Amino acid sequence: MAPIRCEIFDPLLPEPQAREMLRLCEGFGRYGTYAEESVADEFGNVLPQRYDAAVNFVRTGGRFARREAVETLAARTNYFRETYAYGDEIRLPGIEPFHRHEAFLEAARKIHDRPIVRPAIVYANVLVPGQELAVHTDVPEFRGMNRKQDPQWLLVAMHHSGLFERWRIPIATAVAYFEGCEGGEFVFYPDGRDGAPHTLAARHNTAVILDTDTVFHGVDRVADGERAIPPIRPGAELVFAGDGSWRVELGGEILARYRWGEIRFSVSWKAYCFADAAEERAVREHSDDVTRAQALATLMADLRAREKLGEETLPDRELALRIIDEYIRFPAPREGA
């Protein structure tokens, strides 16, 4: 079975089940801004976790090279997220059919040409008018290294370097849309960063599945009708207010009000993919792990081979920036679009 690059589902679910996803979203009630994780050691925090994507967004103005104040760009990307399921832990009763959706399981097998698929997480992303998601690749995992204990920018650079495929745990990601909105298209680059971008409208009851650890992707701006985006900062919450309405709250203050059809609601599903029981067991038993020290030594040796690093010892921050600049190359923006 040859691997596939992506698969699109239209429709994804029978309509009654799709409407139930909206009721589940409403029932969850409150959605916080996506909180950046931290790593509990000095090297892990020399840079913000997704410094690579954030700096590229500020530097370039995003996919359409829009120039705005840093504070505005931050509000545009302080979107809302909550987790519905983690491993076998169901945090939102009723999400189980989506968590074990057979069409996702079958497509994941095709994406990585691996027959064993283990659902890992289900989470919701909600963007309000004026928000977008900068083009990026997701944080991969390796045997022995993951985002809970290692810098996210390092994991991303490791994957883009191509030097650590032996240890990578393939992950398939599905993104499903419910209710729909104007704008907020899913953009992805299935032919690589130099290829043409593909866009999918955020239409109700549709989905796409692909390898988001490898394929650059993002979310175009949700239509705002020229309305100014509210000053959304970490700590803000998107709260369901009943009768199809939502409000953004921060410190007891209501910053904005929206209705279904204005906000972009998506549910993401991620799963680990294994070739056989031995590969899965190697993850569980840590029998063939890569360490951070090993990863850094490998990257530094490769940088020297590329004549991008001398024999000197760089400060941690400078080394981190050198790694990001060399290995994580983003698609070019469309100037003047």
Language model region names:
Residues 57-147, 151, 157-167:
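Signature of the catalytic double-stranded beta-helix
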Residues 5, 9-13, 92-96, 100, ...:
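Conserved aromatic-histidine-acidic binding/catalytic patches
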Residues 170, 181-336:
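Catalytic core of Fe(II)/2-oxoglutarate
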Residues 163-168, 176-179, 258:
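Short, conserved, surface-exposed binding loops centered on an aromatic residue
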Residues 8-10, 116-125, 185-188, 209-210, ...:
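A structural signal for short, well-ordered beta-strand segments and their strand-loop junctions
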